[in-house]
Amino acid sequence: MSKPITFVTGNAKKLEELVAILGPSFPRTIVSKKIDLPELQGDIDEIAIKKCKEAARQVNGPVLVEDTSLCFNALEGLPGPYIKWFLEKLQPEGLHRLLHGWENKSAQAICTFGYCDGVDAEPLIFKGITEGVIVEPRGPRDFGWDPVFQPSGYDKTYAELPKSEKNTISHRYRALALLRQHFEKQDKLIN
């Protein structure tokens, strides 16, 4: 039997979405643990790999880490992986105002999961991207920048969409679909 995978997060909403998206049929047991990992700088993949290695070292077993980016095309990818700090200082209204002088309001929501089987294993990266636009904040404000991100093809922001619908189109869903495929493929090789 496989060891449980420790999802390293202190964000209850991320854990809630992960559990809802993976569902009961996911072939591994997921437990969560809050660990203070260093806040890293770099590109999206570098950050996920470094976080994953440090988490595996601290947990001494299989870990899953997640890093989310919101990349404004007019700002050449900013705030990107630094969205947490931009949101903390600017709130959703400020994120929207960042693009005030730009015609291009397009953005990418990017979720990067890093999985590491243990201390000596190399991390695997699973990345999901959802295209959209930045709009004036709409909807509940209970999950980060969801009120300002409107996915392409929708007239509602992430915050306005029912969770069940958001969880079938989001950047997190897309990354977790790749993670699920990895473990299902691995299980077929074992069985």
UniProtKB/Swiss-Prot annotation:
Gene3D superfamilies for the chain: 3.90.950.10
Short name of one Pfam family: Ham1p_like
Cited NCBIfam families: RdgB/HAM1 family non-canonical purine NTP pyrophosphatase
Compartments, record wording: Cytoplasm
Keyword annotations of the record: Cytoplasm, Hydrolase, Magnesium, Manganese, Metal-binding, Nucleotide metabolism, Nucleotide-binding
Cofactor: Mg(2+); Mn(2+)
Subunit description: Homodimer.
One cellular-component annotation, GO: cytoplasm
Source organism, top-level taxon: Eukaryota
Binding site for ITP: 9-14, 51, 67-68, 84, 143-146, 166, 171-172
One GO-annotated biological process of the protein: deoxyribonucleoside triphosphate catabolic process
Cofactor note: Binds 1 divalent metal cation per subunit; can use either Mg(2+) or Mn(2+).
Molecular function per GO: dITP diphosphatase activity; ITP diphosphatase activity; metal ion binding; nucleoside triphosphate diphosphatase activity; nucleotide binding; XTP diphosphatase activity
Protein name: Inosine triphosphate pyrophosphatase
Species annotation: Drosophila melanogaster
Entry binding sites for Mg(2+): E39
Function: Pyrophosphatase that hydrolyzes non-canonical purine nucleotides such as inosine triphosphate (ITP), deoxyinosine triphosphate (dITP) or xanthosine 5'-triphosphate (XTP) to their respective monophosphate derivatives. The enzyme does not distinguish between the deoxy- and ribose forms. Probably excludes non-canonical purines from RNA and DNA precursor pools, thus preventing their incorporation into RNA and DNA and avoiding chromosomal lesions.
EC number: 3.6.1.66
